[in-house]
């Protein structure tokens, strides 16, 4: 049986990863484009996220606009939005299961059922981590591919935003926390030893006349 400290550590890491996924989803910094004109005053930075894009001027002014339609996003960001939302929901289910199966809670009385619930929670967190790392890595791959593509204009080339690094950190926390929770082994049920006795044969009766 894994110690309570290991279980608490796994839950804490997974919850931090869950919060980081929500931050990754909310921040409009998946892709960053920098336009620098002849005058530094005219320079601006464009942030592209899953829900909106923002234009940051060199003066510090920032204007954000929510996407009018889902079709306004590129295909990789459309898929990323769906997968990240699913990851948040799956991780929330993992948090609920970890609370139910926690050693310090009384939702379940059976220790074996608690351990099995924590294992399921760990698997759910692992799934949530995979659902995050796939869209983040896919978006980063497309950004790097376009950056080194000579056919793409320099003004259209983008760089990786902070949301991608937050997403990688979130997936790492979820995978690590889920892995620790999967170390919960159900306690062995010691079956009482039942000794079987064979009926002793009585000694041969004396012969009666």
Swiss-Prot record:
It is found in: Cell junction, Tight junction; Cell membrane. Phosphorylated. Phosphorylation by EPHA2 is stimulated by EFNA1 and alters interaction with TJP1. One of its GO terms (molecular function) is chloride channel activity. Residues 1-9, 103-117, 182-209 are cytoplasmic. It comes from the Eukaryota. One of its GO terms (biological process) is renal absorption. Interacts with EPHA2; phosphorylates CLDN4 and may regulate tight junctions. Directly interacts with TJP1/ZO-1, TJP2/ZO-2 and TJP3/ZO-3. Interacts with CLDN1. Interacts with CLDN8. Belongs to the claudin family. This is Claudin-4. The gene is CLDN4.
